[in-house]
């Protein structure tokens, strides 16, 4: 399986997988928006960014409309998790030291990239990356998972990853979270309790997922071997190279930091608004 979007002449690699507990998920959303702007303006090659955040639950805008959201968020914080509202769609997901996030950032200046194309590119990359482990990766909604979607990635019917997209100023960010190690069911149980406390049996206009923890697992659980974030990083870079592109390491540059500051201010304001300000006192 391959995809033309993966055949970039150069890939700019930005690895932020070892920044530690002070690295806030809000920073990642602002960084991806800044990189989308740079790539869309033709000031950067295509980007592959890898990132890890410790003990964070990222909510979608719809999650903040739960009738008992205050109690649900208090529960997450008591369990030791930061709570962040993302700047795009989707629903609640768990990030921790065993979850690898990957962003592929493409320019949309010459040719329009259909939404389906973005998803298919990430699916193709993951299928190729995991083929060496003997895994057959499938794409399709896994009912009972958290943040369900038509591009849930699964092995043997158990979800280990979810894909999303964001488009900013001519740049397209295709993002995936990969549950590399740890318990997929334990992560799902956390989100099941979040929705249980957030709804408390009330009917809601939005159809929140009824999470079934047993339909989710980590790659380590599914493949029967203990995988590390670093091992998956090497597999990712080797797989990208196999599509013919040159990879080089990089960090954000001066102009990108200026854009980052703007997007950071927006995401902070969004979180203060979505979480009604006083909820942030727990962070």
Curated annotation (Swiss-Prot):
Pfam entry (one): LplA-B_cat
Pathway this chain belongs to: Protein modification; protein lipoylation via endogenous pathway; protein N(6)-(lipoyl)lysine from octanoyl-[acyl-carrier-protein]
Signal peptide: none
EC number: 2.3.1.204
Keywords assigned by UniProt, alphabetized: Acyltransferase, Transferase
Any one Gene Ontology BP term: lipoate biosynthetic process
Positions of the record's site feature: Lowers pKa of active site Cys: 159
Positions of the BPL/LPL catalytic domain: 42-248
CDD domains documented for this protein: LplA
GO molecular function, one term: lipoyl(octanoyl) transferase activity
Cited SUPFAM superfamilies: Class II aaRS and biotin synthetases
Entry keyword Plastid: no
Residues of the active site: 147 (acyl-thioester intermediate)
Annotated catalysed reactions: N(6)-octanoyl-L-lysyl-[glycine-cleavage complex H protein] + L-lysyl-[lipoyl-carrier protein] = N(6)-octanoyl-L-lysyl-[lipoyl-carrier protein] + L-lysyl-[glycine-cleavage complex H protein]
Disulfide partners: none
Family per similarity comment: Belongs to the octanoyltransferase LipL family.
Known function: Catalyzes the amidotransfer (transamidation) of the octanoyl moiety from octanoyl-GcvH to the lipoyl domain of the E2 subunit of lipoate-dependent enzymes.
HAMAP family: LipL
Other remarks in the entry: The reaction proceeds via a thioester-linked acyl-enzyme intermediate.
Name by which UniProt lists this protein: Octanoyl-[GcvH]:protein N-octanoyltransferase
């Amino acid at each position: 399986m391959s995809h033309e979007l993966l055949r970039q002449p150069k890939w700019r690699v930005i690895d932020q997988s070892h920044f530690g507990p002070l690295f806030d998920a809000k920073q990642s959303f602002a960084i991806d928006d800044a990189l989308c702007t740079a790539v869309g303006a033709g000031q950067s090659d295509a980007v592959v960014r890898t990132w890890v955040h410790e003990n964070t639950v990222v909510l979608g805008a719809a999650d903040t409309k739960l009738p008992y959201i205050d109690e649900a968020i208090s529960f997450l914080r008591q369990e030791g998790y930061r709570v962040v509202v993302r700047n795009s769609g989707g629903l609640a997901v768990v990030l921790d030291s065993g979850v690898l996030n990957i962003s592929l950032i493409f320019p949309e200046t010459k040719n329009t990239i259909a939404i389906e194309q973005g998803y298919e590119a990430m699916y193709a990359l993951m299928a190729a990356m995991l083929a060496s482990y003997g895994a057959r990766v499938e794409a399709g909604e896994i009912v009972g998972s958290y943040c369900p979607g038509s591009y849930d990635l699964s092995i043997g019917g158990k979800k280990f990853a979810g894909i999303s997209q964001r488009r900013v100023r001519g740049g397209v960010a295709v993002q995936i979270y990969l549950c590399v190690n740890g318990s997929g069911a334990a992560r799902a149980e956390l989100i099941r309790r979040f929705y249980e406390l957030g709804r408390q049996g009330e009917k809601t206009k939005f159809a929140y997922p009824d999470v079934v923890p047993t339909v989710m697992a980590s790659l380590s659980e599914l493949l029967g071997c203990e995988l590390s974030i670093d091992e998956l990083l090497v597999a990712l870079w080797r797989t990208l190279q196999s599509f013919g592109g040159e990879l080089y390491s990089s960090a954000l540059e001066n102009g990108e930091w200026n854009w980052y500051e703007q997007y950071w201010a927006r995401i902070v304001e969004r979180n203060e608004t979505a979480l009604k300000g006083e909820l942030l006192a727990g962070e």
